[in-house]
């Protein structure tokens, strides 16, 4: 998938609706009903008009509302604008479930860069720090789409082979990195709970301090491999790291 076109959705978010205003929290999927077309606070996030979109639908499972994604040689997502300090809200917590892997997917290769589930987080930053190659790439994206890429993008993915914790550099830009949150077939078909220190992961991936978080997205994509996949997303939340209690606190 050409992330250049897709990720512009993280940068230039319209502010014509209350649901599209950057917030200091994420609207939960479970607060919705399955009859809603889209979860509150989220909007469609497309690649381009020539790409088939992935289908996202709110459904009920075991009494809670979740998002089901169905990809058929497709790529698109849902995005939620944010305004968060990752040094304060360091912990990113979510649930996801994958029924089957994408057999041909390999995120280390640009022609097979698909994943059954992705969490995509965009960060603000000083564009003057971009190197020449990234400046050229960002300029090309802006010329093609009319929108500006975020300064940095960090993804959490489910990979076929790469080990958990591996950081994979995007083949198009050094400002897009993928962290392997889950790998292989062992945990297919069951809900998986994930918690990651996004502040630490950003520093490990980019070698610098993160700027403010400007958006989060979910994405299931199979446009490169042409395969079919179903996946499920539960609530996504950002949390503070609990401060250890001390004698001074009275405990």
Model regions and ranges:
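Bacterial N-terminal signal peptides
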Residues: 1-9
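Extracellular carbohydrate-recognition regions
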Residues: 11-47, 132-139, 248-251
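Short carbohydrate-recognition loop motifs
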Residues: 54-76
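Extracellular/lumenal carbohydrate-interaction signature centered on repeated Trp-anchored short motifs
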Residues: 81-92, 185-188
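Extracellular-facing segments of soluble proteins and assemblies that are Gly/Ser/Thr-biased and enriched
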Residues: 88-142
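Extracellular/luminal beta-rich ligand-recognition
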Residues: 114, 124-172
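Extracellular beta-strand ligand-recognition surfaces/modules
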Residues: 117-119, 174-184, 188-226
